[in-house]
């Protein structure tokens, strides 16, 4: 399975959070949004300019800027959840 930064994951793909490489304060905030190692994430859509992007975690849609998402690493489990 591929591991990639969440910001690089294709729209329609899904995976499991492998790790988060951010300062504790930011990681703590992301944990409250559902971004924890082992959590399933779907990449739903991106803004027309590419940033921010919307992800689904436990049935909740969450928007993140790429500058944050580039530090969250995802183990890809599905290339396109629409198929």
Label for each model-derived stretch:
Residues 50-83:
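C-terminal structural segments of small proteins and small subunits
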Residues 13-26, 75:
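Short, structured beta-strand/loop micro-motifs enriched in basic residues and often containing a Trp
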Residues 2, 25-29:
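Short alpha-helix capping/helix-loop boundary micro-motifs
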């Amino acid at each position: 399975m591929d591991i990639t930064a969440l910001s690089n994951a294709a729209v329609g793909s899904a995976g499991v959070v492998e790790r988060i490489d951010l300062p504790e304060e930011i990681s703590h905030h992301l944990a409250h949004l559902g971004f924890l190692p082992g959590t399933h994430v779907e990449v739903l859509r991106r803004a027309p300019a590419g940033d921010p992007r919307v992800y689904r975690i436990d049935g909740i849609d969450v928007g993140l800027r790429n500058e944050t998402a580039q530090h969250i690493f995802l183990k890809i489990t599905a290339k396109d959840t629409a198929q």
